A protein has these predicted regions:
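Extracytoplasmic gate region of multi-pass secondary transporters
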Residues: 36-37, 237-296, 300
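Helix-breaking motifs and short loop linkers at transmembrane-helix boundaries and internal kinks
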Residues: 49, 81, 102-108, 119, ...
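Conserved MFS/SLC helix-loop-helix module at the cytosolic interface between two early adjacent transmembrane helices
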Residues: 68-107
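Helix-to-loop junctions at the C-terminal end of transmembrane segments
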Residues: 69-81, 167, 295-308
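Cytoplasmic membrane-interface "Motif A"-like loop-to-helix N-cap segments
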Residues: 78-90, 304-317
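Cytoplasmic helix-loop-helix junction between adjacent transmembrane helices
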Residues: 112-150
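Glycine-rich segments within core transmembrane alpha-helices of 12-TM secondary carriers
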Residues: 142-167, 187-188
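C-terminal transmembrane helical hairpin of 12-TM major facilitator-type secondary transporters
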Residues: 307-348
Length: 348
């Protein structure tokens, strides 16, 4: 006899035990990835070698480490335990983030940024390709992932004013940017252990599920995996030469250049245009991030309601490009903040 499952109750359970802790991991990851953008507002005063060119290269070196270790890390997690691997990712990136406070040379700056990328590399594929499929069926996954995607903007809303405030703290004789790196490394280090106890990598291990719920999720996952094996398999070369894949890669590349360029340079650009203090810049940046969060939810709902995808993406990218393009030509601080708001809506 088949036992009826309360789907709403089951989803609420997974919201608390899976989506919420993974959401917090994503928030912490974003904070530690881009805190260098805020530290850059004051680092150059204490590190004479830190030119804009070196800062930009160091910000980008992160993605070199990310590139080399993303796929291997995801394969390891798929073979062993996704939750243990996510905890490892968090702990190691927290250590590297803390070490950033003690860098003294250009080489160390590049090294730590590379290591940060290498440590964090497989986080997204492990979450979306390894952990979530075991907990959420195909029809539920979009809802779970959409909730996760808001984590970047939530992190920016909380992280920008926090970073600005920390930059004006000189604890134990350290500079503000050193304080920022050390204190923002702590959440990753501490939450590692919370995450290990909070999240299980598969339903069978979850004490908060009933036996029927465990069996239901396990059976749904196995059926989905069985269907996947019947789909045509592509070689790596076939995937890399597929025209649709190449077009999507180009679109994603063009968007990601604007997205990360905006995130890494926005604090310094606003500070340069306005002359405001680091703390005021931090609080000001929370405004465009808040507007972008509202726009992201509204834009996603509009796309889901109408079923239209291409023009929603194209319009957002155009808005972002317009905001980025006009910002350098605006000298008034409040108007420049308005331009940044436009850019944030588009690129986010």
């Amino acid at each position: 006899m088949e036992i009826e499952i309360d789907q709403a109750r089951l989803y609420r359970k997974r919201q608390l035990h899976i989506i919420l802790p993974v959401f917090l991991v994503s928030v912490i990851a974003y904070l530690d990835r881009v805190n260098v953008a805020y530290a850059g507002m004051t680092m150059s005063k204490d590190l004479s070698w830190l030119t804009p060119e070196i800062f930009g290269a160091g910000a980008g070196v992160f993605f070199l480490g990310y590139f080399f270790f993303e796929v291997p890390g995801a394969l390891i997690a798929a073979r062993f335990n996704a939750c243990t691997w996510i905890a490892r990712i968090m702990f190691t990136w927290g250590l590297v983030c803390g070490l950033m406070a003690f860098m003294h040379s250009q080489t160390e700056f590049y090294l730590y940024r590379f290591l940060l990328g290498a440590c964090e590399a497989s986080l997204s594929p492990v979450i979306y390709a390894v952990l979530f499929p075991k907990w959420f069926m195909a029809g539920e996954r979009a809802k779970a992932i959409s909730a996760m995607l808001t984590s970047l903007l939530v992190a920016a809303i909380l992280g920008a004013p926090t970073a600005g405030w920390l930059l004006e703290m000189n604890l134990f004789g350290m500079h503000g940017w050193q304080t920022l790196f050390i204190l923002e490394a702590l959440p990753a280090l501490l939450f590692t252990f919370v995450f290990l106890f909070w999240v299980k990598d598969r339903p069978e291990k979850a004490s908060w599920l009933t036996p029927a719920e465990k069996a239901y999720l396990k059976d749904a996952y196995e059926k989905e995996q069985a269907k996947i094996t019947t789909v045509r398999k592509y070689t790596v070369w076939q995937a890399l030469t597929d025209k649709k894949v190449l077009r999507l890669c180009l679109i994603y590349f063009l968007w990601i250049v604007g997205f990360w360029g905006f995130n890494f340079w926005m604090p310094q650009v606003l500070k340069g245009l306005s002359g405001w203090s680091a703390s005021l810049v931090g609080f000001a940046i929370a405004i465009p991030m808040g507007i972008a969060l509202i726009a992201q939810v509204a834009w996603g709902n509009s796309s889901s309601r109408t079923g239209e995808k291409r023009w929603h993406v194209a319009a957002a990218m155009f808005i972002g490009a317009f905001g980025l393009g006009i910002t350098p030509f605006v000298q008034n601080p409040l108007l420049s903040l308005g331009c940044i708001c436009i850019a944030a809506v588009g690129v986010s």
